[in-house]
Amino acid sequence: MIKVVFFGTSTLSKCCLEAIFQDPEFVVCGVVTQPDKVNERNNKINFSAVKQFCIENNIPCFQPEKNIQIKTELAQLQADIGVCVAFGQYIHNDIINLFPYKIANLHPSKLPLLRGGAPLHWTIINGFTTSSLSVIELVQKMDAGPIWKQKDFKVNPNWNTGDLFEYVQTHAPQFLIQCLKEIVSGKSQWKEQINPPTFGLNIKKEQERLDLNLEPKAFINWVKGLAPKPGGWLEFEGQNIKILQATYLGKMTSTTAVGQITKISKQGIEIALANDEIVLLQIIQIPGKRAMGVSEIINGKHPFAEGKFFH
């Protein structure tokens, strides 16, 4: 039996934890996840998906502000290996060294490309046609450890970040389990990351505003890359309208001002980018309302009209 301590917080983390927990070759002897967060709207405490799974399956769960605070407790578990999936917290070197096989980290990009906390968003924003699942040894430098194995896959050109996440969530758990078994079996295949890295850091608030001066392909990639969350937006009459799906239509034959609505139909809202390029906004979200197709919005009262502007 392989004794594991799991570090993770997100929905992807929970999927990987569940797969490890259900595999008869593993024993999950402890889980470390982020401290609970308080919902500012209703003041209720929100558990991470990982903590909820631990409660349901009676797995010891630790939630330190800093993981070095539980070094003694983790040492007492005498685990063989640590596993990290989207933990969201720096792991101290003293914690890494508790485990004979160190800590294996799953990262959903073709490392050394897109080190950081938002590789899925940046895969779509950058228009990548391929990506990878990477299992690396966790080291102090962010996502810089030697690579155990990578599993390449094609990125569907129609995917947004949500679609890519669903793919990763479906395929990552079993790939991770395969790698863990190989690591503990003593096979020695670690390879250092040699090529220069790029970074896929967390999306900043100011990056959520879409740029109408981009080339059409880049604009569409930003729409897809920010969808469904956090959602890229454009300003319209004082409101931030999220643009969750858009398509490039082509170039206007006449000169059109950037951001101007040129046509509204059941297919969507046509607006101009720079150089008279036209994109079709198909799914949008008005503040306080759910995301809707434009075909549904125009059936009711709405503020949009030809000649008005997005900014």
Curated annotation (Swiss-Prot):
The keyword Transferase applies. One of its GO terms (cellular component) is cytosol. Attaches a formyl group to the free amino group of methionyl-tRNA(fMet). The formyl group appears to play a dual role in the initiator identity of N-formylmethionyl-tRNA by promoting its recognition by IF2 and preventing the misappropriation of this tRNA by the elongation apparatus. It is an enzyme of class 2 (transferase). The keyword tRNA-binding does not apply. (6S)-5,6,7,8-tetrahydrofolate binds at residues 109-112. It catalyses: L-methionyl-tRNA(fMet) + (6R)-10-formyltetrahydrofolate = N-formyl-L-methionyl-tRNA(fMet) + (6S)-5,6,7,8-tetrahydrofolate + H(+). GO terms for molecular function: methionyl-tRNA formyltransferase activity. NCBIfam families: fmt. Belongs to the Fmt family. SUPFAM superfamilies: FMT C-terminal domain-like (SSF50486), Formyltransferase (SSF53328). InterPro entries: Fmt, Formyl_trans_C, Formyl_trans_C_sf, Formyl_transf_N, Formyl_transf_N_sf, Formyl_transferase-like_C_sf, Met-tRNA-FMT_N. Keywords: Protein biosynthesis, Transferase. This is Methionyl-tRNA formyltransferase. CDD domains: FMT_core_Met-tRNA-FMT_N (cd08646). Gene3D superfamilies: Formyl transferase, C-terminal domain, Formyl transferase, N-terminal domain. Its EC number is 2.1.2.9.
